[in-house]
Amino acid sequence: MFAKQIDIHWQKMKGIKFLHWLLGTVLLWVSLSTPALAIPALDYNPWEAIQLPTTATILDMSFIDRHHGWLVGVNATLMETRDGGQTWEPRTLVLDHSDYRFNSVSFQGNEGWIVGEPPIMLHTTDGGQSWSQIPLDPKLPGSPRLIKALGNGSAEMITNVGAIYRTKDSGKNWQALVQEAIGVMRNLNRSPSGEYVAVSSRGSFYSTWEPGQTAWEPHNRTTSRRLHNMGFTPDGRLWMIVNGGKIAFSDPDNSENWGELLSPLRRNSVGFLDLAYRTPNEVWLAGGAGALLCSQDGGQTWQQDVDVKKVPSNFYKILFFSPDQGFILGQKGILLRYVTDLTAAPA
């Protein structure tokens, strides 16, 4: 009888242990499968969605003044606005074919430039009423990736392999600013003062260049995650976006030192594509699947603009031409326009 009671007690103990194990397993599974708590929602939406009269992807935009601007994109897409970007009208150029990818457009006053690939360069001095094609050297390293209008016939061009050139005579002659290219780039950004930062095609390293240097300076990435995009903060630091939905900012005193990786969305399922400052403290971060976040403290804490999640587009590029004029470029002819009378954000 005593042995039977021990056996019954032992069976009960095993049953309790099994229940504890089962409960622990269920709790672990729930904790791993439940997404992290969402970040706070932005209590206003300053962005208006615009569907352009095209399904082409838009790659760049530039304004002559607050009202008159131009945008460019794939399939030789060229459009003009005269109402600050509320409406856009297609413009057609007589080219040898329509497969050009217009990568970049830039205006300084009425003088403007467009570059793209296969290698092509267009120039206007009358605000875009007429465009002339500038011949490019067949030996040009790579294809034009970015153009910056500097005014009075001057411009700076960089190719997709990092060759930098400057003209002072409306494109008749070009001076090389670096001795050699750096290879194919994934992303490229220029600071207002003329510095460049470029991410390598594989995201394994980045390179920087400052006016006066004759060569790019390579830098190893400081994280095991691959780099996606990099750019400049208003105070001259660098920011980076890496795979997995994380960002980081360089140290104010040493650009080689970086702060910790931040996860603005608190999960790794969204890839961010671009970052831009509206003011010295207000930062916008855009990415895939309609992801759009805003920080009011320079990128330390974030809120999500949930109203734009219904827009069926990835957001590739953020452009602010002033604190109250900005655009976000999407896919299939979709834009977001910053509308000041919709926002309660601080200036």
Curated annotation (Swiss-Prot):
Location(s) in or outside the cell: Cellular thylakoid lumen
InterPro entries membership: PSII_CF48-like_dom, WD40/YVTN_repeat-like_dom_sf, Ycf48/Hcf136
Motif annotated as Arg-rich patch, chain positions: 202-226
Single biological process term from Gene Ontology: photosynthesis
Keywords: Photosynthesis, Photosystem II, Signal, Thylakoid
Entry function: A factor required for optimal assembly of photosystem II (PSII), acting in the early stages of PSII assembly. Also plays a role in replacement of photodamaged D1 (psbA). Assists YidC in synthesis of chlorophyll-binding proteins.
Protein name (Swiss-Prot/TrEMBL): Photosystem II assembly protein Ycf48
Taxonomic source organism: Thermosynechococcus vestitus (strain NIES-2133 / IAM M-273 / BP-1)
Designated gene of the protein: ycf48
